Amino acid sequence: MCRIGAIKSKKKLHPSIALKLMRSQQEGHDDSGFAFVMQDMGGHFENYKDLPLLSMAATVEGTRLAEDILREIGFTRVMQWSPDINNKKGLKIEAMPNYIFEVLQYPKSYKHATKDEKEELLIDTAIKLRKILEETNSGYIYSFWPD
């Protein structure tokens, strides 16, 4: 079952606020997960709005595969943040070993690229990452786009 909710605010809000949208729908939840889109982020990511942010969950092998592909294309890491995982007893969560949020610099060859050229690069790269992670069952790419 799909659940959709939205919060729009002129001031920054903590992402956990979005999880409150699920409260009224706890009964009958099919463990399919919950995802949300964040824009105009503050905190760790506030100073990197023009650079692509990769968000992914992966095994150790999946992380290595993704890093190899990104390096081969010419992306360089500017900043990486990993959330703390809270493994409480009783929760039916099968956590991946790595949850990664990386801000990346475009390849040097894209220094003077147009917006359309950069967007095409990001889409092609995300597809390449998703394909290899799916084939190896080693992770998921959630987003690869600037804020």
Provide a role label for each language-model segment:
Residues 1-147:
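N-terminal segments that mediate ammonia production and transfer
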